[in-house]
Amino acid sequence: MSWIILVIAGLLEVVWAVGLKYTHGFSRLTPSVITVTAMIVSLALLAWAMKSLPVGTAYAVWTGIGAVGAAITGIVLLGESANPMRLASLALIVLGIIGLKLSTH
């Protein structure tokens, strides 16, 4: 169950990371409320997952999901570049996340 909670926390990290772009420095109310809410819930779920997962593993997986998710969102929705080096780097992060999951008992 902790892994599911951690994945949800990571997905919410994507929401708030991308949401920051739309807040315009927290000057727009609706995107700001959504972003801050996603931040709070994401951190709360991360803390909950860390009760039974190793801190280093949980934090690395959380940030990895957020980084990969934000980068993919940027590529797909925001027209950011998807050059081979960037895609290979994202693949390495995903492999690291898988490795951390497989090495945690």
UniProtKB/Swiss-Prot annotation:
Indicate where this protein resides in the cell. Cell inner membrane
Q: Which GO terms describe its molecular function?
A: transmembrane transporter activity
- Cytoplasmic-side segments: 22-28, 79-81
- Name this polypeptide is given: Guanidinium exporter
Q: Which UniProt keywords apply?
A: Cell inner membrane, Cell membrane, Ion transport, Membrane, Transmembrane, Transmembrane helix, Transport
Regions of this protein lying in the Periplasmic compartment: 50-57, 103-105
Q: Which Gene3D superfamilies match?
A: 1.10.3730.20
Q: Does the keyword Transport apply?
A: yes
The similarity annotation says: Belongs to the drug/metabolite transporter (DMT) superfamily. Small multidrug resistance (SMR) (TC 2.A.7.1) family. Gdx/SugE subfamily.
Q: Does the keyword Transmembrane apply?
A: yes
Q: What is its main location?
A: membrane
Segments spanning the bilayer are: 1-21, 29-49, 58-78, 82-102
GO cellular component entries: plasma membrane
Extract the InterPro entries matched here. Answer: Small_drug/metabolite_transptr (IPR000390), Small_multidrug_res (IPR045324)
Q: Which domain of life is it from?
A: Bacteria
Q: What does this protein do?
A: Guanidinium ion exporter. Couples guanidinium export to the proton motive force, exchanging one guanidinium ion for two protons.
Which Gene Ontology terms describe the biological processes this protein takes part in?
monoatomic ion transport
**Entry membrane topology:** Multi-pass membrane protein
Q: Name one Pfam family in it.
A: Multi_Drug_Res
